Amino acid sequence: MALLEPLSLYLPTQPEKTVIKAYNTYSKAERKRIMTQNPASFLHILGAGQNDVEPTLAIRWAYEKVLQSSAYQQYTPGYWVYQIEASDRTYTGLVAGLPLRAIQQGKLRLHEATFGARIAKLGAYLEDVQIQAEPIVAALSDAEQLQSLLEGKTVGKPTIEYTFNTRTHRLWQVVDVQTYTMLEKELATFNHCYLIDGHHRAAALQYVASRHLKTKPIHLLGYFLPEAQIKAASFFWFIRKLPKTFQATLFEKLGPVASCDANTLPNVHYPIVFRLHKQTYTIQKQGEWYPQLCELYRLLEESEPQIEFFPRKNKQSLTHSFAKKTPDFSCCYLPLSFAEIQKVADTHGQAPPKTTYLHPKLLTGQFLSPL
């Protein structure tokens, strides 16, 4: 039996006007401007419950209304080859469904811990709205044959093509019998995949399923790529207020710590750089540095501060990124490579939440999959 299965999806008829970035990346002013200027924006659906006493039910009604309109077209169950062309690279993968039973059997390998409160909140949301609007992203190992098959499909004219925020998006529906048969045969060779983005969404789907044991089989909407295409980045961690007494505990538990120039960037010798009360330090590498990152997160969590996160761009130092925020504590680190992530997942380990920031990131509202 193949790891992945075909899905019946709804796709927007005007994707360049409909799709959005992650909802939380828009400011209130941006959301208001877009919703005023663009009646087709997916923000209208997500904002439907903003002033409602039952917000998730209001969003569900907004979904039902839009799916009955001409804004979305329903397609027969199948696979979609999806290509994202960015300025620096091109991603080519497969949009398909990962059955819940595969997740329960451990075939979706995880590498990052999650926040329980967020899972419960997202699970309750999914339970009410009954729609998945953003795929998880997962990587497939030893997928050269699959990549060749997918790239062969991209030679033809795409079923859908549009540009959003300078990126070109192309979709090919797999409808010819020969390609479909070859694709299913190739998918049958995979026993598992690695979750790259969407740990909370995957956990929330299991939450919903656990509350409705007798419902129809549930699939996790996903975008599946060969591992070689995954691009690794990382987060900044910062804490606005941290007791000064925490410094002694931190230095005692972390091992060799050395002060350094404020603009020091993480490197192979000093993979973790942090700033504490306006002084910058590095943690010296001793064997694998990843356990030190886990220990740092644990110590911060035990002190009960509010840890905040945002993605780190290449070559950004702590002083560059926090010049206006001046938090008591900030940290940046080398991205974990896919090989390191794979090792964590294969040994059933867990990186701290918000440790890995991996590309590609997908749009919301491009694929709708009813539960």
Residue spans for each PLM region:
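Surface-exposed, charge/polar-rich loops and edge strands
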Residues: 1-371
